[in-house]
């Protein structure tokens, strides 16, 4: 027992930094920003005149997708089958030439309905609870909000509009800008 403790102390002293780097590189810790949702503008009867809807950026983390050879093909096939505007040659190019990149935006402002087939394919399980597609790796969705005006130009001079994301420029959007805006959150995991 004393010999084992002595050996562990020797390894820690001579190679501790090397092993610490290996352990830290294997950890799957991440932190994500949770975007705030700008408040709705409603009339006296509760009719929504301005609202924010969730949209998603499709993000490719090439370092995860290319970490094992068996992840590349299934991930690219899933992306091209679920998103018709994605090209497999472009995705293979990212895998080959940007394999260290952790953040490549593949598609901006996709609706929930557009990303749902991919999410279902990625999370599908069989009757025993085992993942059907365990090799789809390195794709995630970045949520943000887009301002919408259900009645278009109706009362637009009063309601106003936003620019540069969530900055009220005119009308109620500008007057109540501080009230309508929120603060981004953060999720750790």
Predicted regions, residues:
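Periplasmic/cell-envelope proteins involved in peptidoglycan metabolism and beta-lactam response
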Residues: 1-189
């Amino acid at each position: 027992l004393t010999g084992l403790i002595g050996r562990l102390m020797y390894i820690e002293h001579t190679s501790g930094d090397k092993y610490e780097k290996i352990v830290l590189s294997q950890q799957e810790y991440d932190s994500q920003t949770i975007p705030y949702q700008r408040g709705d503008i409603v009339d006296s009867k509760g009719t929504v005149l301005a609202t924010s809807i969730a949209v998603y950026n499709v993000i490719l983390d090439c370092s995860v997708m290319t970490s094992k050879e068996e992840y590349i093909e299934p991930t690219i096939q899933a992306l091209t089958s679920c998103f018709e505007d994605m090209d497999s040659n472009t995705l293979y190019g990212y895998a080959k030439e940007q394999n260290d990149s952790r953040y490549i935006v593949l598609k901006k402002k996709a609706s929930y309905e557009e990303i749902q087939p991919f999410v279902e394919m990625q999370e599908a399980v069989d009757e025993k609870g085992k993942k059907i597609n365990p090799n789809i790796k390195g794709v995630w969705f970045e949520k943000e909000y887009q301002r919408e005006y259900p009645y278009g130009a109706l009362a637009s001079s009063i309601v106003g509009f936003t620019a540069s994301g969530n900055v009220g420029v005119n009308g109620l959007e500008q007057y109540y800008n501080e009230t309508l805006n929120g603060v981004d959150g953060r999720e750790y995991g």
